Amino acid sequence: NHIHDAPHMAVQFTGNDHLIAHNDIHHVCLESNDAGAIYSGRDWTWRGTVIRDNLMWEITGFENRGCVGVYLDDMLCGTEVTGNLFYRVTRAAMIGGGRDVLVENNLFTDCEPATHLDARAMNWASYHVGTTMKDRLDEMPITDSLWAERYPELLTIWEDEPAAPKGNIIRRNVCQGGTWDGVRDDARTYIDMSENYVADD
């Protein structure tokens, strides 16, 4: 697909196990800032989506104030972001307090920053944990055999510091130009950030 010149998102997904691949996305979110070219958020149970082999470029938000490339908002978990090319995207790969996200084998060029991880559920967004997030978890049949086999992390998430952004991996990416590391200090202890190549200007 070729998705471009749009006022808001290019792709929004909900649910599980989607494949979002081989899209050319540019000049979207032209009238938006707290938005993403590819967006989902605020549900621990929406897992298994793979975002791969996409080209995302010139995505900077309304009046260049900044938006997001892949926006995993408000504790979204279990998503893979692999093999994408980002050029001139603000917050190209953003993990908004979620866990079990893999960002691997992507190329970031002139992004500000290339990667972002925060621990929002442990501070300013903590009110979602015992309300929206818990309610949506309880609505799903996570103890049924199919769910338990496919998403075993959901069986223990409520007892395992559910607000902590655990299990995130950012590795084997390449960053040229722009800013590489937008990981917040309160989230840094929870991330495996390794084997990335950041080119010097």
Residue ranges, per PLM feature:
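Glycine- and acidic/polar-rich repeat regions and solenoidal domains
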Residues: 2-201
